[in-house]
From Swiss-Prot:
Family: Belongs to the peptidase T1B family. HslV subfamily.
Main location: cytoplasm
CDD domains assigned: protease_HslV
PROSITE patterns in the cross-refs: PROTEASOME_BETA_2
Full protein name: ATP-dependent protease subunit HslV
Pfam families registered for this protein in UniProt: Proteasome
UniProt organism field: Shewanella sediminis (strain HAW-EB3)
Catalytic activity: ATP-dependent cleavage of peptide bonds with broad specificity
Length: 174
């Protein structure tokens, strides 16, 4: 699977992801880019789950962002409604972590939209490791959101066999 982590602190939001693509117990690719900028570079998005499924979701989510002029919450809720009602989408196995300058959200494979506490998101096979590390760093250091995301992803990659050390990191400063 993968690890995606998003951290918000001091007018900065970051989404970071590793690059490993696995098929069963085999590493197929080590430098996949699972974090992207959407809607005129104003929205960050990362995915965990099936790669083809995630690209389908990225396309649909970007269309919703365009439809709602970049309003993240409205686009996410509309995407979730589609996910629940569209037979094809219901079969997609992926999670999206999305963020802009106002909020951070998880869009789940069940069609749920979750705004996490503390604006900390972690999804994927190494998500619990990354979340634990990021929580400790948020509570006990003055590191930037970028530094916390990078360090927590490194820790997850050291522990989770489905997460590697190749990182894609996108940040928004506001």
């Amino acid at each position: 699977m993968t690890t995606i982590v998003s951290v918000r602190r001091n007018n900065q939001v970051v989404i970071a992801g590793d690059g490993q693509v696995s098929l069963g117990n085999t590493v197929m690719k080590g430098n996949a880019r699972k974090v992207r900028r959407l809607y005129h570079n104003k929205v960050l998005a990362g995915f965990a789950g099936g790669t083809a499924d995630a690209f389908t979701l990225f396309e649909r989510f970007e269309a919703k962002l365009e439809m709602h002029q970049g309003h993240l919450m409205k686009a996410a809720v509309e995407m979730a409604k589609d996910w629940r009602s569209d037979k094809m989408l219901r079969k997609l196995e992926a999670l999206l972590a999305v963020a802009d300058d106002t909020c951070s959200l998880i869009i789940t494979g069940n069609g749920d939209v979750v705004q996490p506490e503390n604006d900390l998101i972690s999804i994927g096979s190494g998500g619990n490791f990354a979340q634990s590390a990021a929580t400790a760093l948020l509570e006990n250091t003055e590191l930037s959101a970028l530094e916390i995301a990078e360090k927590s992803l490194t820790i997850a990659g050291d522990i989770c066999v489905f997460t590697n050390q190749f990182k894609t990191i996108e940040e928004l400063n506001y």
